[in-house]
Amino acid sequence: MTLVSDAMIFAACAHDGMLRKGTNVPYIVHPAEVAAIASTLTDDPEILAAAVLHDVIEDCGVSGQELAQRFGARVAALVLSETQERCGDPRMTWEARKRAAIAQIARGDRASKIIALSDKLSNMRAIRRDFERDGESVFARFHQHDKRRHAWYYRSCASLLKDELGDTDAWRELNEHIGHVFSEDDAESCLQEAAYAG
């Protein structure tokens, strides 16, 4: 069994019974799509394994030590680079967690940025599909209901990923989805909020 297929089986077991927010879609569809997107950017099996495992620490209670023992230290480190800490009321901590995630992207190497781009693109594909069907109500399924804050987060991520990966089809697709879902007004409002808060 290859590292990537072993990681896929592990992730499928870890996410068993979980659904994507506000849908009946099995959660494993998301990490599988993240790995598929990452495979257009690299053939490194450790990056692809980490891509499919990227949510198992954050969402499934798997430890970094367990991942390191099973898949190696680099895979575990890459998954940890994609892991957002949660504490207390998620609505109270959303912005702090997203700021930490943005900081992780900023200091990450190319491997971690490939996973971050793949994750954000998978998420934006789902948001766009649901936005086109359900409109603004799509944001009610998230802990953070304010569309402008999501605009700030995804635009910030795309901006940080541009230098390393802006010449890729994946980045261009991410940027196109962001432009479609989030108007310039949403982004401008969020920039003003961030400047005021900063």
Where are these regions (language model features)?
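Active-site helical microenvironments for divalent-metal-assisted chemistry
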Residues: M1-G198
